[in-house]
From Swiss-Prot:
GO terms for biological process: modification-dependent protein catabolic process; proteasomal protein catabolic process. This is Proteasome-associated ATPase. Residues 1-27 are annotated as: Disordered. Pathway: Protein degradation; proteasomal Pup-dependent pathway. Belongs to the AAA ATPase family. The gene is mpa. ATP binds at residues 302-307. PANTHER family: AAA-FAMILY ATPASE, PROTEASOME-ASSOCIATED ATPASE. It holds the Pfam family Prot_ATP_ID_OB_N. One of its GO terms (molecular function) is ATP hydrolysis activity. Consists of three main regions, an N-terminal coiled-coil domain that binds to protein Pup and functions as a docking station, an interdomain involved in ARC hexamerization, and a C-terminal ATPase domain of the AAA type.
Length: 615
């Protein structure tokens, strides 16, 4: 390309229309313009009409060709601009790919000269910040990005992954904490700025520990799980996973004493033991009477031990609200339901630690003046008599831990321990002595009168009753329900052959026939009513006749007894002896008396070996 052509090409990006043409097109265009000018002169000189028309046509063709060339050159210019933009983008991509890698670190502190201390690659370093970084906005514990010259060029978020440690205590400066990590290793860590800020919030401006819908910061407390970077020595956030929450159900139960039938005497006992000390503290102080620290509810399964414990928490909350003048609907108490078997842990010391956390949580709740019920269900599975373990001796350390919590140096103000068990003989005697579980209440199997009371909780006037049954009592629903309950209880407690269950032979040669009533429970009564309701529903679907009938209940009793024919396989012989009034007598022989059972052969029980709860 000649110099003139290069100069013409360099003018392609000019502002004049001609400067946008290539050199060849510009020359051709100039030639066309000269021809057009000549033709115009000829047209002006020629006077003939034909010559004028031909010249005008030629001029029009030349102008059309000029427009076509101009459009083609404009398109070429657009293509050139697009290519230039793509080249620039590729150059930026090449530059980006060629940049050295960036490092990350944890900000430890900001100095007065706007340098910062950063922990990166296992080292603590003092670095400078890019002018784009506002050092005043940096927060301790924050992640920062470093360039190849180890200059802070970007501020990131707080670390979201790491190890979990348990907070032991916050040190006096409020910026450091003692945490316990893996294998009970203790270390001091710095608290990231969000955690420090939560500790200095004024009263009422932070979230309640149990309100999961509140997004405000929460104050730290011992036992909390913290996300920790052990290398940088920083704790970043509180993880809402206190280990005790897996084993504890914090709730305000909705069970009242009115929901419990047939246990009036036991309810009065537990109200005297639990509610009086809470509601009349001044009288107890006046008489120098120490409130009981714990209550043991023992008896056969399914007789209402857990229901009573829940009702205590509910009633106590309402009574405390009345004393304080608060709204009964906002009554507050805590029922810590400990899942006994899940409390056990295969690692040495873990079970004891969970027990400490549970009582620590209870003390925190109770410090606010709120009653706290710590309920240990199946207490015999956790606090068994020391020295009786067959494959392990875990009870030798778990039992002392509970004893130290109940009557240790730290008092249990506003905390009551309630234990429930159907094998109270297996619980360590040190727990059952006065001063620990002071009050022991036996929840017995219901007699006929108690059974009627329990039935009345499930058979209410609101239930649909069959018209034929209502007609017998002139449509009076109350009398109908009462008659149904009486008939059902009479059938259930009748000493007839159909109700015979077992023949027990004692070591002294005495024999005794036991009936199904001797093994009745509130749970069985509820099951009978539920079966009857199901039969009534099936009758509606099959015949269209609505309503519960007495026959549905009687049939349910037969079905329930039939399902419990194997009850001897799951009942403790010592319990049978207590029911029959022959305490201390060994059972040496059992014969089932259930009619129509194919496998009703007599069965001897070897009482020399330790049978435990299950035969």
């Amino acid at each position: 390309m000649s110099e003139s052509e290069r100069s013409e090409a360099s003018e392609v990006f000019g502002t004049s229309p001609d400067s946008r043409l290539s050199s060849e097109d510009a020359a051709e265009l100039e030639q066309l313009r000269r021809e057009a000018a000549i033709l115009r002169e000829q047209l002006e000189d020629a006077g003939g009409l034909a010559t004028s028309a031909r010249a005008a046509r030629d001029v029009h063709q030349l102008e059309a060709r000029i427009d076509s060339l101009a459009a083609r050159n404009a398109k070429l210019m657009d293509t050139l601009k697009e290519a230039r933009q793509q080249l620039l983008a590729l150059r930026e991509e090449v530059d980006r790919l060629g940049q050295p890698p960036s490092g990350y670190g944890v900000l430890l502190s900001v100095q007065d000269d706007e340098t910062v201390d950063v922990f990166t690659s296992g080292r603590k370093m003092r670095l400078t910040c890019s002018p784009n970084i506002e050092t005043k906005e940096l927060k301790k514990g924050q992640t920062v990005r470093l360039n190849e010259a180890l200059t802070v060029v970007e501020a990131g978020h707080f670390e979201s992954v790491g190890e979990i440690s348990t907070l032991r205590e916050i040190l006096s400066d409020g910026h450091r904490a003692l945490v316990v990590g893996h294998a009970d290793e203790e270390r001091i860590v710095w608290l990231a700025e969000p955690l420090v800020a939560a500790e200095h919030l004024p009263e009422g401006s932070y979230a309640d520990e149990d309100d999961l819908t509140d997004d405000r910061p929460r104050k730290l407390r011992p036992g909390d799980s913290l996300l920790v970077d052990t290398k940088a020595g920083y704790a970043f956030e509180r993880i809402p996973k206190a280990e005790v929450e897996d084993l504890v159900l914090e709730e305000v139960p909705d069970v009242s004493y009115n929901d419990i039938g047939g246990l009036g005497r036991q309810i009065e006992q537990i109200r005297d033991a639990v509610e009086l000390p809470f509601l009349h503290k001044e009288l107890y102080r006046e008489y120098s009477l120490r409130p009981p620290k714990g209550v043991l509810l023992y008896g056969p399964p399914g007789c209402g031990k857990t229901l009573i414990a829940k009702a205590v928490a509910n009633s106590l909350a309402k009574k405390m609200a009345e004393v304080r003048g608060d709204d009964a609907r906002e009554a507050k108490s805590y029922f810590l339901n400990i899942k006994g078997p899940e409390l056990l842990n295969k690692f040495v010391g873990e079970t004891e630690r969970h027990i400490r956390l549970i009582f620590q949580r209870a003390r925190e709740k109770a410090s606010e003046g709120t009653p706290v019920i710590v309920f240990f269900d199946e207490m015999d599975s956790i606090f068994r008599t020391r020295g009786t373990g067959v494959s392990s001796d875990v009870e030798t350390t778990v039992v002392p831990q509970l004893l130290s919590e109940i009557d240790g140096v730290e008092g249990l103000e506003n905390v009551i321990v309630i234990g429930a068990s159907n094998r109270e003989d297996m619980i360590d005697p040190a727990i059952l002595r006065p001063g620990r579980l002071d009050v022991k209440i036996k929840i017995e199997r219901p007699d006929a009168e108690s059974a009627q009371d329990i039935f009345s909780k499930y058979l209410t006037e609101e239930l649909p009753i069959h018209d034929d049954d209502l007609a017998e009592f002139s449509g009076d629903r109350s009398l109908t329900i009462k008659a149904m309950i009486e008939k059902v209880v009479d059938r259930m407690y009748a000493e007839i052959d159909d109700n015979r269950f077992l023949e027990v032979t004692y070591a002294n040669g005495d024999k005794e026939v036991m009936y199904f009533k001797d093994f009745n429970s509130g749970a069985m009564i509820q099951n009978v009513v539920d079966r009857a309701k199901k039969n009534a529903i099936k009758a509606v679907l099959e015949t269209g006749q609505r309503g519960l009938r007495i026959q549905h209940l009687l049939d349910s009793i037969i079905d329930e007894f039939a399902e419990n024919e194997d009850l001897p396989n799951t009942t403790n012989p010592d319990d049978w002896a207590r029911i029959s009034g022959k305490k201390g007598e060994r059972i040496v022989y059992i014969r089932t008396l259930v009619t129509g059972k194919s496998s009703s052969a007599s069965r001897a029980i070897d009482t020399e070996s330790n049978l435990g709860q299950y035969l």
